[in-house]
Amino acid sequence: MNMEYKKVELTEGSIYKITSLGSRDKLLETEGVFKGFINIGVDETGLLIELNKNHGDMAGKIRIVPLHVILLIDVLDAKTNSKKDDSKEMSHYVG
């Protein structure tokens, strides 16, 4: 079976539905626009999600979802990565 996979990455402006661990016996669903990553403390990272209208009064608010509680991510609307990849350019100092 020959399957081709393209590189997938979380891109700012894309819309995702994230299912994560919530309270003891409950899963938490977060749906909205991905705004980026944030460092939480010293060694933890989270996703910044602007909540959509499905969250009622919380719509427009930012939710931080720690990476270690994420179970799955559904890609609802993917945007292309418009940021320039600096790692492909040679960086040096001339002075």
State where each predicted segment sits.
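Conserved RNA-binding domains used in RNP assembly and mRNA/RNA metabolism
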Residues: N2-G95
